[in-house]
Curated annotation (Swiss-Prot):
Chain positions recorded as [4Fe-4S] cluster binding sites: 77-78, 142, 172
Protein name (Swiss-Prot/TrEMBL): NADH dehydrogenase [ubiquinone] iron-sulfur protein 7, mitochondrial
Quaternary structure and interacting proteins, as annotated: Complex I is composed of 45 different subunits This is a component of the iron-sulfur (IP) fragment of the enzyme.
Swiss-Prot/TrEMBL keywords: 4Fe-4S, Electron transport, Iron, Iron-sulfur, Metal-binding, Mitochondrion, NAD, Oxidoreductase, Respiratory chain, Transit peptide, Translocase, Transport, Ubiquinone
Transit peptide stretch: 1-56
PANTHER family: NADH DEHYDROGENASE, NADH DEHYDROGENASE [UBIQUINONE] IRON-SULFUR PROTEIN 7, MITOCHONDRIAL
Known catalytic reactions: a ubiquinone + NADH + 5 H(+)(in) = a ubiquinol + NAD(+) + 4 H(+)(out)
SUPFAM superfamilies documented for this protein: HydA/Nqo6-like
């Protein structure tokens, strides 16, 4: 079960996947990782098989962290800022974050805009088709809680009612810089956690 990433005013974040034996503290300003609780057992490999498994595990984490493929799910005006993040000023492609046209190739879905009641089953089906491990970014006030259309009968008040959300980006609309920061934070989160800790949340 995923817990929300909580930010405080010092620029630190606690990230945990709900596992009691493993927890990290990230210092987002300095880019350091401090292990608060060590995993049970030894940290060094005892034989060649464990060394090969650890090396393969590190390679898999590196590939996931530095080549995440998002699926852009633009529903309203927040999608303009999402497109701006891929334009020449920020150019997310140079970080390996290349948008994919199909959910079967994507690991991240960026929901940007108002999710209506008719769109919720489609969003859920797209989420189910994505490969594991998968992450969800809710971008903008409308995707976070309904926003300007919160009291409308036809609007889903937050996309987390349809799919589990990992990151929330506030704003109406949020800037492209906030999306870039969120994707870099997600890259750090992928890099500093174990692959087997990610649960299949279908």
């Amino acid at each position: 079960m995923l817990r929300r990433t909580s930010f405080n005013f010092t620029g630190r974040a606690m990230i945990s996947r709900g596992s009691p034996e493993w927890s990290h503290r990230l210092d987002l300003k300095k880019g350091k990782k401090t292990t608060m609780m060590h995993k049970l057992g030894t940290s060094k490999p005892n034989n060649a098989l464990q060394y090969a498994q650890m090396t393969l595990h590190d390679l898999t984490e590196w590939c996931l962290a530095y080549s995440p493929w998002p699926l852009t799910f633009g529903l309203a005006c927040c999608a303009v800022e999402m497109m701006h993040a891929y334009a020449s000023r920020y150019d997310l492609d140079r970080f390996g974050i290349v948008p994919r046209p199909t959910p079967r190739q994507a690991e991240i879905i960026i929901v940007s805009g108002t999710v209506t009641n008719k769109m919720a089953p489609i969003l859920r089906n797209i989420y189910v088709q994505m490969v594991n491990p998968k992450w969800v970014i809710s971008m903008g006030s409308c995707a976070n809680g309904g926003g300007y259309y919160h009291f409308s009968y036809a609007v889903l008040r937050g996309c987390e009612r349809a799919i589990p959300v990992d990151f929330w980006i506030p704003g109406c609309p949020p800037s492209a810089e906030s999306l870039v920061f969120c994707l870099h934070t997600l890259q750090k989160k992928i890099r500093w956690h174990e692959i087997q800790k990610y649960s299949v949340r279908d």
